[in-house]
């Protein structure tokens, strides 16, 4: 089981959003078309903490219940917060997770109405 570190939380559109990361297990050579020299240089910079190489996760909650999520692997940034503040991926992930949460809420309400009808 992977351990995720919470990096950022926010409340938006009636949902509590949690952004967390875990180290990427995939090797850089499997994700980028780099020369051997570029690959070695980049790996050294990751090892020294100059860059962060991670999987990103966005989870969306309402009243403490997980209703939606989105994941993205192969993220290479100066820091995970750079991903939040400067990439378009973070906003897309939040949007996708909220769409899933909204869908799940609608299904729950529908099934609840069927039970009580």
Regions found by a protein language model. Name each.
Residues 1-117:
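Acidic interaction surfaces
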């Amino acid at each position: 089981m992977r351990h995720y570190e919470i990096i950022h939380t926010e409340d938006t559109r009636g949902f509590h959003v949690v952004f967390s990361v875990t180290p990427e297990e995939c090797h850089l050579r499997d994700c980028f078309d780099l020369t051997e020299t570029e690959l070695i240089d980049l790996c050294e910079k990751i090892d020294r903490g100059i860059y962060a190489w991670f999987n990103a996760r966005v989870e969306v909650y309402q009243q403490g219940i997980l209703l939606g999520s989105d994941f993205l692997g192969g993220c290479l940034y100066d820091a995970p917060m750079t991903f939040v503040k400067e990439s378009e991926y973070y906003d897309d992930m939040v949007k996708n997770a909220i769409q899933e949460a909204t869908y799940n809420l609608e299904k729950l309400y529908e099934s609840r109405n069927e039970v009580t009808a």
